[in-house]
From Swiss-Prot:
Source lineage: Bacteria, Pseudomonadati, Pseudomonadota, Gammaproteobacteria, Enterobacterales
Mutant lacking the gene: phenotype: The deletion of the gene leads to a substantially decreased growth rate in minimal medium with adenosine, inosine or guanosine as the nitrogen source. The deletion mutant also shows slow growth when grown on adenosine as the sole carbon source. Deletion of the gene results in increased intracellular concentrations of adenosine. The mutant also shows increased resistance to some sulfonamides. Deletion of the gene increases intracellular arabinose concentrations as compared to the wild-type strain.
Domain of life: Bacteria
Stated name of the protein: Purine nucleoside transporter
Record localization: Cell inner membrane
Organism encoding this protein: Escherichia coli (strain K12)
Periplasmic compartment residues: 28-41, 93-94, 156-159, 230-237, 292-298
Induction: Induced in the presence of adenosine or adenine. Expression is controlled by the LysR-family activator PunR and the nitrogen assimilation regulatory protein Nac.
Similarity field: Belongs to the major facilitator superfamily. Bcr/CmlA family.
PROSITE patterns: MFS
Keywords: Cell inner membrane, Cell membrane, Membrane, Transmembrane, Transmembrane helix, Transport
PANTHER family: INNER MEMBRANE TRANSPORT PROTEIN YDHC, MAJOR FACILITATOR SUPERFAMILY
Listed transmembrane segments: 7-27, 42-62, 72-92, 95-115, 135-155, 160-180, 209-229, 238-258, 271-291, 299-319, 341-361, 362-382
Gene name per UniProt: punC
Length: 403
């Protein structure tokens, strides 16, 4: 028997919690700085430390959830996050702020890993793509809405209210854990000893993860460079903020369009066409940099096409990466998310480093263009195992499992 709509809503809540924790407090940076009487760099460091903890701790929670079960590990992770959020109400200095933000990151990333594992645990394999396609657009929407919610709380209350809200949301998400029933899928102990190295030996896994990470890195490169690009073009901060709205809508269209398309076609049939759309849109965005006096609309049109492609690509490649490891999905999701965040961080770092050397638009779009090569490489990897190298790849994984 498949889970109902309430279970799906709960999974969606788990999926966006990490982004709420990341982005809701961004509008409060100045208020936190003034209240704690600390340098702006210390408040900014709280975000960097959070992202570092969020990326690294996933490698802990994933294997633990495979070994000890989703229920206890998720309960521990969310409890840690709730306590970290509650502690933020009494922060009096920058050091405590940094420590508690790291505690929050370690706790909340349990939800980021385990919600993906729960999808593969509780839904039949033929429906996993559609479930990811239903949830992932909300993941893309949350970074746009979280700062708006944070701003509203800041205007009407104080910056501490942001973390009180996160605490309340977490408590609501903790309660259903107590009613979480064990999965009915048969247990396969052969994957209990699967390591991260074993996962990377699978061309299907690393190919799909590379596609996921590269598409995300292209988006993060734009997020890093776009404020400089649009400021140089003469746009106000208000217009720059509004420029992210069509991108978010485009991502939603891609995600829910993919969900509808999956009722008629398989993910592996849709993927090559979506990757072509991604490549063409990125190349068009890069080419716009050579137009003299380029306008915001001329840049946003191809970029929004890329956002549509990403919204449709994500659920397909995530499902394809996790499917071969039904009893090691915690580890598989953890490594996938860490590699994705790592490549996004690298793309953002390169844009930040080069943006003072060349024009912001050309620098940013050139970094985006490099991700097309990585996407092509990822597709060739997973395609090779599908059509010609599958037996060899499976033999490698089987050999590693036997050891």
């Amino acid at each position: 028997m498949q889970p109902g709509k309430r279970f799906l809503v709960w999974l969606a809540g788990l999926s966006v919690l990490g982004f709420l924790a990341t982005d809701m407090y961004l509008p409060a940076f100045a208020a936190i700085q003034a209240d704690l009487q600390t340098p702006a760099s210390a408040v900014s460091a709280s975000l960097s430390l959070f992202l570092a903890g969020f990326a690294a701790a996933q490698l802990l929670w994933g294997p633990l959830s495979d070994r000890y079960g989703r229920k206890p590990v998720l309960l521990i992770g969310l409890t840690i996050f709730a306590l970290g959020s509650l502690g933020m109400l009494w922060v009096e200095n920058a050091a405590t702020l940094l420590v508690l933000r790291f505690v929050q990151a370690v706790g909340v990333c349990a939800a980021a890993v385990i919600w993906q594992a729960l999808v593969t645990d509780y839904y039949p394999s033929q429906k996993v793509n559609r479930i990811f396609a239903a949830i992932m657009p909300l993941v893309g929407l949350s970074p746009a809405l979280a700062p708006l919610l944070g701003s509203w709380l800041l205007v009407h209350f104080s910056w501490q209210a942001i973390f009180a809200t996160l605490f309340a949301i977490t408590v609501v998400l903790i309660l259903p854990i107590f009613w979480l029933k064990p999965t009915t899928k048969a247990r396969n102990n052969s994957q209990d000893g699967l390591t991260f190295t074993d996962l990377l030996r699978s061309k299907t896994y690393r190919g799909n993860v590379l596609i996921y990470a590269a598409c995300s890195a292209s988006f993060f490169a734009w997020l890093t460079g776009s404020p400089f690009i649009l400021s140089e073009m003469g746009y106000s901060p208000a217009v720059i903020g509004l420029s992210y709205v069509p991108q978010t809508i485009a991502f939603l269209i891609g995600g829910y369009g993919c969900r509808a398309a999956l009722q008629k076609w398989q993910g592996k049939q849709l993927l090559p066409w979506l990757l072509v759309l991604f490549a063409v849109s990125v190349i068009a965005t890069w080419a716009a940099g050579f137009i003299s006096h380029v306008s915001l609309v001329e840049i946003l049109i191809p970029f929004c096409v890329m956002a549509i492609a990403n919204g449709a690509i994500y659920p397909i490649v995530v499902a394809q990466a996790l499917r071969p490891f039904p009893h090691a999905t915690g580890r598989a999701a953890a490594l996938q998310n860490t590699l994705q965040l790592g490549l996004c961080f690298l793309a953002s770092l390169v844009v930040s480093w080069l943006i003072s050397i060349s024009t912001p638009l050309l620098t940013t779009t050139s970094v985006m263009l490099s991700t097309v090569v990585l996407v092509a490489l990822g597709y060739m990897m997973q395609r090779c195992e599908e059509v010609g190298c599958q037996n060899h790849g499976n033999a490698e994984v089987a050999h590693s499992e036997s050891h």
